[in-house]
């Protein structure tokens, strides 16, 4: 039996592509463009795992498909190479993070090239290259000049173990850090902020213009969190102080029985009475140790302290005790709420716990038992009584505005983006703080502000980054003799990844971020493939920067990514015990088709789980490429199931994909190829061209491969294979298995040219229709024969053919035919006696 040798074929074609710059981006202005973008990886020390190539293979298939369809294709790759892991490694080992990163990139690039992806490596970018981050810094200076980058004393999410503050988006639901899982505490610090809130409405509205999964759009909508309601001003009794509350339900103001301020609210100390001062100070201290997520957890026990003061409800003059509680955040809304315990679960629980008044203002429910959170007509509400929700809100807003104690208001949950990190391994923020109290941006002519090389990269612990220790870099003097210090904070990893897709378009430009004409030619990105875990962070930040650049006239489109696709996760083989705990694969043995714990003998259930070192179920693509070949890995990952589904890795599935490719190789290299078309494969070939073309376009790669298998099965039944169909089939499979595609193309054509730019095959619609049809012949209602006849024969012709059939003649010999019923294209029924 013939098998192909992937160890010879794959390196041969990889060298051919590299030597001939086969995948250099096309520049023919008469052709349509296609920009296929992968989320570029962070080059970790662990290298690629088999999850990475799933998305990369999808964009590669599309890129090869579009090249063959006559498009200029931009399909680049680069490295998101700043970030904490390299710095952590450097601190642990004493090595330079730049050297460590360069080694990791070389390893990633080797692995990626071994998988046969058609990247244009002339466009490679690296976020740690000063020629790249010059423009990251330039974007920052533009944000600064526009007032969109500013310094503020803000409570930050401080992670002691990392020695840095992190953004809200980087705090996990359990209140630990996304990176490392460390405890997060709130701590006030001077920080750089980016005013993403100025773009909240546009970030929301323009989601309508992009072809993204609805689930991702919803995550962004929820994160932006637009609310329409009213601001209401409450005066503090016996003082000249007041505070503002934002509420989406101003119609329930008659039911507000107490107010709650965030412990950090500026008014707290001023209105706290002497009797309550100690309790309030204690409570504030405890609250500062909790993350926002821990504080707002709905399930946690309600805690709070009364300030000793009262607010006056503006609508009825009632006195409302003012409390502080950690479930109210200073960073959200106004940092103060009016509590309507009859109609809000959290307020109800708080009121019950601290014995506060509960006054129902909506009809329905029993507020002694539980908060009534549905809609109802208004009661106990004076001029709102009997009104429904919408009418009551409108009337109350009108009253508030007329009385000068409130106004209609739109708010957003979105907070400004905490942009500074107290770390070494990041882009220096190009700002100088002068001793006269002013700050200026480093001028463009002096960019890039290069990150200095230093051995001392441990966090200072003072809230400054290790750059504070590099004196000769840190201290500067102006021409007029005024001394200054450079900003010591660095940018977060999100900075370089917020605009990298623009640099691929013009990666070697030293004068500007990218040429305007090239940006017009290539934007927006046509397809962006990556994990759904980036729904809020990266995708929101990139959209924000893109909109700023649009306002600056740098980019011609409002949105960066026209279509987004999230590939699923490839899960590892793993096992669970009876308690549901996962068991590492090296603790499992297989006996008689079942799985058992080596140490306890307990029978285990096979259960796919995320690949992890601890479960010892991480699959290294290097091993797969060595044993089965890159084409097998590519075909297997595309054939596993729908691209957006999470599916378990299977060695059997991998072997099945390899067997299929061996069958393809045998079909083309051992079957007699002929210039004469017998017509036997007309229908299946044309169906295959049509199906694969449509399914690749729709990213339904698994069904495209299934159709290729149908063709192979049909072709194997024939003695000879028509040359045009052999070539067309090889073109169809080449985007999935490019090395094999090139090898078989040469076997058929000996052209010496790559298959990459050979025009994509077309199909003949007329061949999709069967000219013959199978009919059944029934005698006495039982099927006696099946006949293949020309389509659309008349009743008379059908009757003739049926009666002339040998089997039928044997059945009716010596019998009287009473009648013959012929139904064209279906059946002939013969009645005899």
Swiss-Prot record:
The keyword Metal-binding does not apply. Its EC number is 6.1.1.4. It is found in: Cytoplasm. Signal peptide: none annotated. GO terms for biological process: leucyl-tRNA aminoacylation. A motif ('KMSKS' region) lies at residues 610-614. Its main location: cytoplasm. GO terms for cellular component: cytosol. ATP binds at residue 613. HAMAP family: Leu_tRNA_synth_B. This is Leucine--tRNA ligase. It comes from Streptococcus pyogenes serotype M49 (strain NZ131). The gene is leuS.
């Amino acid at each position: 039996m013939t098998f192909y040798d992937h160890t010879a074929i794959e390196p041969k074609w990889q060298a051919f592509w590299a030597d001939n710059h086969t995948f250099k981006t096309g520049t023919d202005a008469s052709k349509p463009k296609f920009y296929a973008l992968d989320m570029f990886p962070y080059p970790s020390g662990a290298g690629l795992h088999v999850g990475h190539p799933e998305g990369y293979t999808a964009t590669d298939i599309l890129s090869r498909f579009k090249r063959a369809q006559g498009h200029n294709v931009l399909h680049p790759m680069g490295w998101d190479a700043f970030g904490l892991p390299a710095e952590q490694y450097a601190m642990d080992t004493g090595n330079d993070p730049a050297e460590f990163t360069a080694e990791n990139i070389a390893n990633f690039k080797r692995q990626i090239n071994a998988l046969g992806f058609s990247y244009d490596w002339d466009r490679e970018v690296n976020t740690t290259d000063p020629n790249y981050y010059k423009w990251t810094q330039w974007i920052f200076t533009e944000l600064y000049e526009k007032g969109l980058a500013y310094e503020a004393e803000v409570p930050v999410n401080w992670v002691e173990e990392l020695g840095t503050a992190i953004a809200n988006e980087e705090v996990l639901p359990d209140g630990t850090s996304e990176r490392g899982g460390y405890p997060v505490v709130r701590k006030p610090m001077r920080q750089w902020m980016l005013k993403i809130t100025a773009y909240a409405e546009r970030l929301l509205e323009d989601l309508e213009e992009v072809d993204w999964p609805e689930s991702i759009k919803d995550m962004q909508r929820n994160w932006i969190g637009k609310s329409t309601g009213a601001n209401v001003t409450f005066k503090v009794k016996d003082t000249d102080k007041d505070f503002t509350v934002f509420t989406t339900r101003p119609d329930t103001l008659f039911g507000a029985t107490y107010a709650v301020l965030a412990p950090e609210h500026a008014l707290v100390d001023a209105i706290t009475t002497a009797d309550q001062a100690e309790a309030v100070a204690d409570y504030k201290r405890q609250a500062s140790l909790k993350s926002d997520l821990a504080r707002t957890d709905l399930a946690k026990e309600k805690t709070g302290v009364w300030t000793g003061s009262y607010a006056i409800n503006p609508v009825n003059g009632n006195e409302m005790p003012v409390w502080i509680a950690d479930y109210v955040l200073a960073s959200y809304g106004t940092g103060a709420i009016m509590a309507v315990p009859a109609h809000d679960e959290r307020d109800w629980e708080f009121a019950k716990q601290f014995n506060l008044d509960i006054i129902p203002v909506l009809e329905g429910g029993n507020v002694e038992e539980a908060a009534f959170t549905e809609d109802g007509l208004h009661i106990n509400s004076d001029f709102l009584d009997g009104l429904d929700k919408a009418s009551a809100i409108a009337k109350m807003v009108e009253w508030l505005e007329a009385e000068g104690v409130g106004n209609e208001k739109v708010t957003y949950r979105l907070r400004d983006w905490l942009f500074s990190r107290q770390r070494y391994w990041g882009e220096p923020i190009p700002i100088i703080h002068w001793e006269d109290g002013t700050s200026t941006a480093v001028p463009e002519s002096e960019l890039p502000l290069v990150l200095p090389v230093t051995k001392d990269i441990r966090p200072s612990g003072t809230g400054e980054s290790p750059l504070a220790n590099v004196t000769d870099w840190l201290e500067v003097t102006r021409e007029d003799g005024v001394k200054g210090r450079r900003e010591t904070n660095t940018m977060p990893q999100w900075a370089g990844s917020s605009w990298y897709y623009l640099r691929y378009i013009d990666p070697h430009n030293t004068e500007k971020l990218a040429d305007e004409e090239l940006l017009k030619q290539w934007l927006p990105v046509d397809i962006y493939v990556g994990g759904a875990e980036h729904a809020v962070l990266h995708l929101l930040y990139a959209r924000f920067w893109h909109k700023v650049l649009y306002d600056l006239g740098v980019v011609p489109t409002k949105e960066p990514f026209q279509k987004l696709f999230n590939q699923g996760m490839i899960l590892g083989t793993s096992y669970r015990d009876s308690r549901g705990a996962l068991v590492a694969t090296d603790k499992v043995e297989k006996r008689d088709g079942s799985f058992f714990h080596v140490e306890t003998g307990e029978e285990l259930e096979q259960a796919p789980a995320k690949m992890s070192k601890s479960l010892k179920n991480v699959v290294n693509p290097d091993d797969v490429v060595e044993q089965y070949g890159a084409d097998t890995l590519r075909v297997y990952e595309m054939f596993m199931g729908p691209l957006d589904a999470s599916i378990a890795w299977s060695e059997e599935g991998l072997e099945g994909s390899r067997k299929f490719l061996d069958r393809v190789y045998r079909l083309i290299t051992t079957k007699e190829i002929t210039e004469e078309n017998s017509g036997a494969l007309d229908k299946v070939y044309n169906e295959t061209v049509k199906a694969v073309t449509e399914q690749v376009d729709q990213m339904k790669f698994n069904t495209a491969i299934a159709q290729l298998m149908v063709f192979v099965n049909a072709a194997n039944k024939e003695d000879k294979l028509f040359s045009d169909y052999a070539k067309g089939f090889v073109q169809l499979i080449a985007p999935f298995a490019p090395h094999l595609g090139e090898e078989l193309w040469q076997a058929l054509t000996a052209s010496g040219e790559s298959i990459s730019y050979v025009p994509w095959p077309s199909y003949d619609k007329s061949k999709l229709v069967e000219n013959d049809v199978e009919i059944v012949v029934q005698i006495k209602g039982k099927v006696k024969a099946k006949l293949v006849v020309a389509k659309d024969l008349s009743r008379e012709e059908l009757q003739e053919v049926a009666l002339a059939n040998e089997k039928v003649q044997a059945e009716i010999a010596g019998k009287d035919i009473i009648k013959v019923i012929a139904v064209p294209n279906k059946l002939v029924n013969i009645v005899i006696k």
